[in-house]
Amino acid sequence: MVKPLYETKVISNGGRDGKVFSEDNTFYQDLAVPKEMGGNGVTESNPEQLFAAGYSACFNNALMHILKSDSKGTIEPEVSVTAYLLPDKNDGGVKLAAELDVTLTDMTQEEAETYVEKAHNYCPYSKALKESIDIEIQVSVN
């Protein structure tokens, strides 16, 4: 493996009703099974929320980089990610899917779609996921 630019290690104990924390103690999160999946409705986070948070931040940063490299660095995109757990017919379990909603300003719809496509090709999360999960991207301009 090439020498990493950055690395982090997160440890999980207790599965979906447990906790996750970083080895350097800068991150800690209690977890709970969502009510929709048989949980007790506790307001703790879950793996899908953490995935959506990471993906939305990473994609937004990739898009900001693409915009800045094209002298549009003053535009502040908004990216939301909805994570889905879907039935997996292959093994009877579940699989992950994601929908990205990207909003840009001060450009045409066609320009926005071009920038979002470039960001999708640049974003580390997208690179890791686009061949393994279903990803839908919606682009809008305000």
UniProtKB/Swiss-Prot annotation:
Listed NCBIfam families: organ_hyd_perox (TIGR03561)
Annotated coiled-coil segments of the chain: none
Protein's GO biological process: response to oxidative stress
Protein name per UniProt: Organic hydroperoxide resistance protein-like 2
Family statement: Belongs to the OsmC/Ohr family.
Organism superkingdom: Bacteria
